[in-house]
């Protein structure tokens, strides 16, 4: 393999992959500006002859940090509201309500063509277009995970469903993207420090027959250029239904510096503006690092099980509002298309490059037992970069909880690697190659070998972005 042989020949360049490589000297001919240089590609897939509106990557990232006055108003609210341990109340919902309003403002009106938001700018993460699960060209959605039979409701007998998603970054968060990707050929994670005020919002859509899921009545449908099913790479333009909206907020008041929240679509609310049918599932401000006694189960969701011993997530207890859903491990926050043995924070805390650990313990080649010392490494309150947090593994660089940042850099390096060929000028005086090198230190493993939870083997050989799918047990 090219990657391996290059690695062998130029061992030692690994450490300089994170932009420490000196810029190449300009050379006549070779460094002529290719068309569009300075712009990142917008998407990876669009059918021949498609005449509808297409996705544009919002990529004019702010060069300076935004003014503090632009910090969203909901930062003044207490995200816990009047929540007290063992006694759930609804105060936290005001925070979620305001946070939702902020994400919607101007974006709903612009039909989520966020570069046209008339109130404030929002942006996208570059380098999500590459590879078989990369961005499609209608909405910019990437292929994420499989939706298992019974995952969304006991009536959902359809299998082979899939999730597609697209994330949007406010100007605080986008400033960080711009810093990391300032040099388009040398992404530099040393700039990965999201400032207070950063908000990232992600819409998730499913390809399942909506009539099988009561909460997907009166759905919000988007057309996407999507695969026939999760296992397929053959695409066509088809509708998907909104199921979930995820948010990440950089707020100094939480133990880690990040707050996670999610909303689930419930068409039974029959709200006049269908976007308002996104009801809050909950908020997670910590990872409950002491909660380790495993009482996980993935029954097909007939009721939402709120676990009283979880202290750093609050979950919506209004059963009329929130459709029955599974949560994360031991009741930590997770959404309907997330893995029940994980949590928002536990996956996101692994964001680092080189990628040295899996996003969840059960994906490790030699998985730990639920609740043991090694398992609990995924359930700690790691700090964000501004609070002095380091990488999940020694010798890596933290990406400040942002997984798309990691995947973008990984995709970039794959592309660089796969295009093959070496420029003579890339060889320095010592015979070392001065270019970004693949930096996946962990061996490539066959994901089917790690299939400990009855999770389906991944059909795509290169699917780092996939969220593990849940397997509800009927
Ligand atoms: C199993 C791991 C996993 C879990 C659990 C998980 N995520 Fe993510 N998340 C990902 C991956 C992988 C991506 C990047 C893929 C993409 O969006 O294209 C991502 C992307 C995101 C993004 C876009 C910014 C970023 O970091 O890339 C947001 C916002 C987000 N997730 C929020 C949440 C919230 C809120 C929850 C819990 C309700 C959650 N996530 C649970 C794996 C996970």
Q: Model segments located where?
A:
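Bacterial N-terminal signal peptides that target proteins for export
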Residues: 1-11
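Bacterial N-terminal signal peptides
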Residues: 9-19
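Ubiquitous "structural anchor" signal
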Residues: 19-20, 355
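Sec/Tat signal peptide C-region and signal peptidase I cleavage site
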Residues: 21-25
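Conserved small-residue
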Residues: 26-346, 351-474
